[in-house]
Amino acid sequence: MSVKDIDIVIDGYPKEVLKFLEKNKIPIKNKFLNYGVFFLKFDEIDCNLTCLREDYGHDGRHSKVIFSKNLNADSKRRDLTINALYLNLEGQIIDFCNGYHDIMNSNLIFIGDYKKKCLEDYLRIVRYIRFCSIFKNPFIPKEYKIFFIENSNLLKKIPKNKLLDELKKIFVNKYFYNSIELIKFLNLENYLLNE
């Protein structure tokens, strides 16, 4: 499997990072300065460059941000433990949330309170379903399934283009059938597969 996209975090503030990118003539595909996010492209690899930050004031899709220099705080804003792994320039893994252990054991675990994480951003429910497609036998806690079923109406609030993007990503993964089976088990076909 070849890498098609890379996420990079940087301990700089958005205007500083923008200045650096422009000074070094690094092409920027898109940017969201309010969130400290820059989309770059190198050859065939998409690169998301994000300033370290903490999120607050969530409304189910968006949040307000405070830029930070704290990698640990940045990790806590992420959805799943497997998405909170960092690799420094020396090649050392930095893991504040037990993500490496969870990858090695096919565990899909939210960071902190799973209900709170999903209510902060409803798309996290769909992302969770998508991440089931990267593991042969993903471990999915029973309480997550119950919560997803009880809160399936939240999926109606997600823009269709965001749902479609996540669904497309499911089908490029080896174990896409895990996600499809979970969608059916959760009875979410009407919310997701008819889009």
Set out the residue ranges of the language-model regions.
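Catalytic cores of the polymerase beta-like nucleotidyltransferase superfamily
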Residues: 1-195
